Amino acid sequence: MSNYRDIAWQGLWKNNPGLVQLLGLCPLLAVTATLTNAIGLGLATLVVLVGSNVLVSLVREFVPKEIRIPVFVMIIAALVTCVQLLINAYAYGLYLSLGIFLPLIVTNCVIIGRAEAFASRNSVVKAAFDGLMMGLGFTLVLMLLGACREILGQGTLFDGADLLLGDWAKGLTIHLWQVDTNFLLAMLPPGAFIAMGFLIAIKNMIDKQLEARKPALEAAPAVTRARITKVS
């Protein structure tokens, strides 16, 4: 159980693909103009990451080491193609909104990195759990960045939710305040870089505070219980 807890901690926080490894920055910065786009790309990446980890773990004993990277890339490309076709069929608006960044999931270093570093060396269950945690960590960063940029740029949340969930989701859009013109800096890639820098800085501050508390806890004297014997 502690092993799985460590895998979850690595993927969600300590070794987060977006905030620590800084992998997949191209789609992370380009697509997160709205929360809806961030959720769509995050879920697509999550599905591919879990699927590729499972398949790589299944075939790891049969693939020669010399050709393992091309085989891993082919597995990832096949999964991305399936996800792309599904989004094209059931969420065409989101498919158009994500554009070229959807097929570019194939080149996402997070996916090929986990396939090589973890899935090819561990069991199917552990590989699937690692893919799930890394995918969730990446998706959470996408969502947080997308929410910040959408709020600052448009004053809304869940704008275009119907692209992901259908026409019924048009009512999910939240208007936080009325803006005459969008704040372009937040909507464009330079704003994404700035917002990403703030997120990384906040994480580093939290990590430093956690590290500072450890010596104090370790230096605290242990409390021993004294036994009192009543003498009559």
Swiss-Prot record:
GO cellular component, one term: plasma membrane
Keyword Transmembrane helix listed: yes
Biological process (GO), any one: electron transport chain
Enzyme class, spelled out: translocase
UniProt KW Cell membrane keyword: yes
Superkingdom, natural source: Bacteria
InterPro entries: NqrDE/RnfAE, RnfE
Primary localization: membrane
Location(s) in or outside the cell: Cell inner membrane
UniProt EC number: 7.-.-.-
Membrane topology, from the record: Multi-pass membrane protein
Keyword vocabulary terms for this entry: Cell inner membrane, Cell membrane, Electron transport, Membrane, Translocase, Transmembrane, Transmembrane helix, Transport
Membrane-spanning parts: 18-38, 39-59, 69-89, 93-113, 127-147, 182-202
Oligomer status and interactors: The complex is composed of six subunits: RnfA, RnfB, RnfC, RnfD, RnfE and RnfG.
Biological function: Part of a membrane-bound complex that couples electron transfer with translocation of ions across the membrane.
Entry's family note: Belongs to the NqrDE/RnfAE family.
The protein, known as: Ion-translocating oxidoreductase complex subunit E
Taxonomic source organism: Shewanella loihica (strain ATCC BAA-1088 / PV-4)
Gene: rnfE
